[in-house]
Amino acid sequence: MLKGSITALVTPFDREGAFDEKAFRAFVNWQIEEGTKGLVPVGTTGETPTLSHDEHKRVIEVCIEVAAGRVPVIAGAGSNNTVEAIELAQHAEKAGADAVLVVTPYYNKPNQRGLYEHFSRVVRSISIPLVIYNIPGRSIIDMTPETMGALVRDCKNIVGVKDATGKIERVSEQRAICGKEFIQLSGEDATALGFNAHGGVGCISVTSNIAPRLCAEFQEACQAGNFAKALELQDRLMPLHKALFLEPNPSGPKYALSRLGRIENVLRSPMVTIEAATAEKIDHAMKHAGLIN
C-alpha cells in the first residue's frame, strides 16, 4: 500500500496567512492526477510547528476528503509529548487516514528506551498502521535499528519507516533486523536512488510537491529494477533536489510552487521567503527539469 512517490505536502496559506483550503484542494487533486502514489499532510514540509491543532486537523480532513480513497493518506501525528501524539493519531484515524507518520520526539532527546515507550504507546492507541519518522537532523536523537526491530517485533501495526538519516547502509541494516516486508521509505530525495537499490520501496518526497510526475516516474523505474532509466530521471531532478534545500524547507518548495501558479509564496514566521539568489538557482533547476521555460 505504501510505496512509490509519496508527497510530503506543503500547507498553502493565503496572503493574510490563513490556511488556503481552496488552493490545497486543487493542489491535492493535481498531485494525484500527476501520478503521486500517497500523500503526507502536516509533516515538516507542511509547517506543522506553526499550525494550530484545529488547523492541523482540518488539513488532514481536507486531504482525506479530496483524495477520496484514490491514494493512501499518511497523516502526520508527531509530537515530543506522547499524550499529544496519541490525541493527534486518534484524530487521524477517526478522520479516515490510512496510516500515521510519527516523528521521533525532538528537543527533549529521549533515550532508546524512551523512544520504544513513546512509539509503543502511540501505536497501541490506534488500529491503523504507523510509520516511524527517523530524522536525527531535526530531532537530534537517532532511533537505532535494534530499537526499531524491537518495536516491529512487539507492535504489529508498526509497518515501516521514513528514513532521513542520510545513511544508505541503514536500509540494509533495518532490512536484516526488521524483515524484508518492513516498508522502508527514503526521507531524502537526493539519495533515494541508492536507498531503493538497498531495498527501499519509495520516497516521502519534498521535490514531488513541484515535480510530481517526474518523481513518480523515477520511483516506478526503481521499483521495476530499471535503474538506467531511474538514473536519467535523477540527472534531471538532482539540481532541483539540491536547490530546494538551499534555505530551510519549505521556503524553497513554496517559492517553486508559486512559480507554477499553484499557491501563494507565503510562510509563517519564523520561516521567511527565500532570497533572490536562491530564487535564481531554483528557477535554473526547474528549467533543467523541464518544469518551466
Swiss-Prot record:
Keywords: Amino-acid biosynthesis, Cytoplasm, Diaminopimelate biosynthesis, Lyase, Lysine biosynthesis, Schiff base. SUPFAM superfamilies: Aldolase (SSF51569). The active site is at Y133 (proton donor/acceptor), K162 (schiff-base intermediate with substrate). The keyword Amino-acid biosynthesis applies. GO terms for biological process: diaminopimelate biosynthetic process; lysine biosynthetic process via diaminopimelate. Its EC number is 4.3.3.7. It comes from the Bacteria. InterPro entries: Aldolase_TIM, DapA, DapA-like, Schiff_base-form_aldolases_AS. The record marks T44, Y107 as: Part of a proton relay during catalysis. Transmembrane segments: none annotated. GO terms for molecular function: 4-hydroxy-tetrahydrodipicolinate synthase activity. Pathway: Amino-acid biosynthesis; L-lysine biosynthesis via DAP pathway; (S)-tetrahydrodipicolinate from L-aspartate: step 3/4. GO terms for cellular component: cytosol. The keyword rRNA-binding does not apply. It catalyses: L-aspartate 4-semialdehyde + pyruvate = (2S,4S)-4-hydroxy-2,3,4,5-tetrahydrodipicolinate + H2O + H(+). SMART domains: DHDPS (SM01130). CDD domains: DHDPS (cd00950). Pyruvate binds at T45, I204. Catalyzes the condensation of (S)-aspartate-beta-semialdehyde [(S)-ASA] and pyruvate to 4-hydroxy-tetrahydrodipicolinate (HTPA). PANTHER family: 4-HYDROXY-2-OXOGLUTARATE ALDOLASE, MITOCHONDRIAL, DIHYDRODIPICOLINATE SYNTHASE. Belongs to the DapA family. Homotetramer; dimer of dimers. This is 4-hydroxy-tetrahydrodipicolinate synthase. It comes from Brucella suis biovar 1 (strain 1330). The lineage of its organism: Bacteria, Pseudomonadati, Pseudomonadota, Alphaproteobacteria, Hyphomicrobiales. The gene is dapA.
